[in-house]
From Swiss-Prot:
Biological role stated in the UniProt entry: Cytochromes P450 are a group of heme-thiolate monooxygenases. In liver microsomes, this enzyme is involved in an NADPH-dependent electron transport pathway. It oxidizes a variety of structurally unrelated compounds, including steroids, fatty acids, and xenobiotics.
Organism from which the protein derives: Gallus gallus (Chicken)
Membrane topology annotation: Peripheral membrane protein
Xref: InterPro entries: Cyt_P450, Cyt_P450_E_grp-I, Cyt_P450_sf
UniProt xrefs under Gene3D superfamilies: Cytochrome P450
Name of the coding gene: CYP1A2
Oxidoreductase among keywords: yes
Cofactor(s) the record lists: heme
Protein name, per record: Cytochrome P450 1A2
Record carries keyword Thylakoid: no
EC number(s) reported in the record: 1.14.14.1
Length: 258
């Protein structure tokens, strides 16, 4: 109901010369299509709901898992810090999102957190718009469908050592860029336009988070074993066991802003 009201308010205050956000963009798209071809209002509300839902719990979960993997994969943390951020960006400023291509190992690290521990094992419910057949199975129109992302992202035929955290798998042979072909196999990118957009935003946020935190700070584990730290807690989105002992240290003396 909250999102429905917000979307309708956008419609009432819509100005084609002042596109404020994605909701306005959806209304503009609707208004520019011929009568009969435009998306119904309900579909726009559902699209906004998908984007809102995909960016709410999953972003915080992704941030939490990425921080946990910085702790449990110290060699990856060190490589992000020393081989990329210190070298490509320097210590005098923060990196920009437009510079992500200069930090391929960091981006590969983010990609690796998705299949290793799939934050959302099953997608939210989808519905078929027509009768269809998939791999010999008949799926009728308006059938509720859940996609098992966990299975796809841990399929041995698609992934080498799917349960092993290995950042390098997403890099090209010369380690200078992301392997586009392999990265597109990550199921999280293939569950619909709205979710794809939201997941792309999630990846930007995690990238920004790591680029802000790791240049100046190093994260280290406390007393638990590595196995205990990454033990998952199952739910609609999968979280890790709470880490009771956690250390964050300055990498070097920071200059005063005064």
């Amino acid at each position: 109901k909250f999102l429905q009201i917000a979307v309708e308010e956008h419609y009432q205050s819509f100005d084609k010369n002042n596109i404020r956000d994605v909701t306005d963009s959806l209304w503009r798209s609707k208004k520019t299509k011929p009568r009969g071809a435009a998306d119904p209002n309900e579909k726009i509300i559902n699209l906004v709901n998908d984007i809102f839902g995909a960016g709410f719990d999953t972003v915080t979960t992704a941030l939490s898992w990425s921080l946990m993997y910085l702790v449990t994969q110290p060699h990856s943390q060190k490589k992000i810090q020393e081989s990329e951020l210190d070298t490509a960006i320097g210590r005098e400023r923060r990196s920009w999102l437009s510079e992500r291509s200069m930090l391929p190992y960091k981006e590969a690290f983010i990609l690796e957190t998705v299949p290793t521990w799939q934050f959302v094992p099953f997608t939210i419910p989808h519905s078929t718009t027509r009768d269809t057949t998939l791999n010999g199975f008949h799926i009728p129109k308006e059938c509720c469908v859940f996609v098992n992302q966990w299975q796809v992202n841990h399929e041995a035929e698609l992934w080498e050592d799917p349960f092993v955290f290995r950042t390098e798998r997403f890099l090209t042979d010369d380690s200078t860029a992301i392997d586009k072909t392999l990265s597109e196999k990550v199921m999280g990118k293939q569950v619909g336009l709205a979710w794809k957009s939201a997941l792309g935003t999630r990846q930007w946020e995690v990238s920004f988070y790591l680029s802000t935190l790791t240049p100046n700070w190093s994260s280290a584990p406390g007393g638990e074993s590595k196995k205990d730290r990454v033990r998952p807690i199952y739910g609609l989105s999968m979280k890790h066991k709470r880490c009771e002992h956690f250390q964050v240290k300055k990498r070097f003396s920071m200059k005063s802003s005064n």
